Amino acid sequence: MEKFKAVLDLQIKHRSALGYGLVTLLTAGGEKIFSTVVFQCPCTATLNLTYGLVFLLVPALALFLLGYALSARTWRLLTGCCSRSASTRSSSGLRSTLVCAQVSAVAALAPLTWVAVALLGGSFYQCAVSGSTRLASYLCKDRNHSCIAKLPQVPCNKQEAEMQEILSQLKAQSQVLGWVLIAAVIFLLLVFKCVSRCFSPVSYLQLKFWEIYLEKEKQILQSQAAEHATQLARENIRSFFECSKPKECNTPSRKDWQQISALYTFNSKNQFYSMLHKYVSRKEVSSSLHSVEGDVVVPVLGFVDDAAMANTHGV
């Protein structure tokens, strides 16, 4: 039991890194299955380029859109946005843009992994480039005149020595592009991580405390919400069967839910660990949590919206 608890604690502590690792492994495995089982280059001048690019880029686009759909911050941003007042929408426009940029960066991980693994494999690239008329003259340079006509057949005709040479050249180009893409992604991730941490308004240990607080808030909110929902449902059912008036059961209003569902902004003057924390700490019960002077979106605190959305989604 202690070992199981230790593994669970490790998973909670490093769930972000484990999640990214799992996404990368699943994407790489999916690409391998896709390229060996589904992909069959048509080996015709009219279809090779289109077929290869479709297999290379369309799954990447699908993974990118799936990354948006699976992001808690996406639905936090979109839910109810069309029913808000014009003044509220305009005031949160910049914050929404910054959040969209952060969500896009995270959602791009899986598609970039797909493209990189596909380029390392080389099959999609070989098929696409062999059907490109612009690259035909370059690939057939210093070769006989029939090379350009035979080029679309390269992915299918692997027996001829000349075809094998061109195929090896295309695979080498594809793998070089794949490693360049991997290096560029790692470099950009490292730069973004370093810059966001450099401009963090709080210290390293406070960030760790912040994560612990959000985890506990999530657990307690889900527990209290389940208990309150059970109590409300039980009272309504009792009232229905007994034909009596239900007892008053205080439940947060629609405005209250909207307040704690807003995007989190950091303010150095009044520091709160979540929108729920900010809501219960407001000076006046009737006051709103709209953006005030000094509120900013901090990239390193993006996990606050994810955790809070998990709370309300769990509700």
From Swiss-Prot:
Record localization: Cell membrane
Keyword vocabulary terms for this entry: Cell membrane, Disulfide bond, Ion channel, Ion transport, Membrane, Transmembrane, Transmembrane helix, Transport
Disulfide bonds: 41-127, 43-156, 140-147
A GO cellular component annotation in the UniProt record: plasma membrane
Catalysed reaction equations from the record: ATP(in) = ATP(out)
GO biological process: ATP export; regulation of natural killer cell cytokine production
Cytoplasmic side: 1-21, 69-103, 193-315
Pfam families, sorted: Ca_hom_mod
InterPro entries from the UniProt entry: CALHM
GO molecular function, one term: monoatomic cation channel activity
Signal peptide as annotated in the record: none
Positions in the Extracellular compartment: 38-46, 129-169
Transmembrane regions: 22-37, 47-68, 104-128, 170-192
Membrane protein topology class: Multi-pass membrane protein
PANTHER family on file: CALCIUM HOMEOSTASIS MODULATOR PROTEIN, CALCIUM HOMEOSTASIS MODULATOR PROTEIN 6
Chain's role: Pore-forming subunit of an ATP-permeable channel. In response to pathogen-derived and proinflammatory stimuli, relocates from intracellular compartments to NK-dendritic cell and NK-macrophage immune synapses where it mediates ATP efflux and NK cell activation involved in antimicrobial and antitumor responses. May assemble to form gap junction channel-like structures with gating and ion conductance likely regulated by membrane lipids and voltage rather than by extracellular calcium levels.
Family membership noted in the UniProt record: Belongs to the CALHM family.
Quaternary organization: Oligomerizes to form decameric and undecameric channels.
Name this protein carries in UniProt: Calcium homeostasis modulator protein 6
Record organism: Rattus norvegicus (Rat)
Lineage, opening ranks: Eukaryota, Metazoa, Chordata, Craniata, Vertebrata
